[in-house]
């Protein structure tokens, strides 16, 4: 977002998501979408999805959510107002670090015509004999154009074998993530009570600033990614880390 996409003419306005008014302030006339994560990397911070969805839709732009850390087992963003959901399938969906891949899920709910900001979907496409994707594909216009043009032009597709491997991982996603959460909570609680640990960042803890959102959006747990700070800072951390290089 910060360094690669600007080379293709796409710029990003970054905001502090802890204050929802920042989203409202950042939206400009040429803003095409709001992009957030269900669980932030690396502190697993949580954003009020429904509130951000309302802001995006008021400005007639879609809400795109990266649900890589959340996974479909823990949260389904479309049920909370997301229009498009993306995943890095390499992480929890695949589960074994064996393949590179990604997923795009189109809710089919966003009105691309009413938005007036997406001529690629509403105007004739000369590379497909003048087809208008909103007419040819209806609610699936967005994801259809991705498959018909962007996949064709960029080659951003995985091999059949890698797709097969990712599907094998998908079959056990719920079982694996359930265990991930169970194990993570044990470690989080252990570290949170450790005398040499200054702070643990995980929304399951009652003192985490997003704990209320955790209870609202993540009844099955908020993933297994967390960070912690040790007393003594960097010097103490390096003392323990360097012997294990």
Which sequence ranges carry the predicted segments?
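Conserved PLP-enzyme active-site core in the AAT-like
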Residues: 1-194, 201
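Short hydrophobic/aromatic beta-strand micro-patches
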Residues: 105, 227-229
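Short gly/pro-enriched beta-turn/loop segments at secondary-structure junctions
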Residues: 161, 195, 219-223
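Structured loops at beta-to-helix junctions and adjacent beta-edge loops in soluble globular domains
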Residues: 169, 203, 229-231
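Conserved glycine-rich beta-strand-loop-beta hairpin in the small C-terminal domain of fold type I
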Residues: 185, 201-227
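Short, conserved charged micro-motifs
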Residues: 233-238
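Conserved small/polar residues in nucleotide/adenosyl-binding loops
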Residues: 239, 243-245
């Amino acid at each position: 977002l910060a360094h690669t996409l600007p080379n293709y003419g796409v710029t990003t306005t970054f905001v502090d998501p802890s204050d929802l008014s920042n989203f409202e302030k950042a939206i400009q006339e040429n803003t095409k979408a709001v992009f957030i994560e269900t669980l932030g990397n690396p502190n697993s911070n949580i954003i009020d999805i429904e509130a951000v969805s309302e802001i995006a839709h008021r400005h007639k732009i879609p809400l795109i959510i990266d649900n890589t850390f959340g996974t479909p087992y823990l949260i389904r963003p479309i049920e909370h107002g997301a229009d498009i959901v993306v995943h890095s399938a390499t992480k929890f969906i695949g589960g074994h670090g064996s393949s590179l891949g990604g997923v795009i899920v189109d809710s089919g709910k966003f009105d691309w015509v009413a938005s007036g900001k997406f001529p690629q979907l509403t105007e004739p496409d000369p590379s497909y004999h003048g087809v208008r994707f909103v007419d040819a594909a209806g609610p699936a216009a967005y994801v259809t154009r991705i498959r018909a043009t962007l996949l064709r032009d960029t080659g951003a597709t995985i091999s059949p074998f890698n797709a097969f491997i990712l599907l094998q991982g998908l079959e056990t996603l719920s079982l694996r993530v359930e265990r991930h959460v169970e194990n993570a909570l044990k470690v989080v609680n252990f570290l949170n009570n450790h005398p040499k640990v200054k702070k643990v960042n995980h929304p399951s803890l009652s003192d985490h600033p997003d704990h209320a959102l955790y209870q609202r959006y993540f009844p099955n747990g908020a993933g297994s990614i967390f960070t912690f700070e040790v007393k003594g800072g960097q010097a103490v951390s390096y003392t323990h880390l360097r012997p294990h290089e």
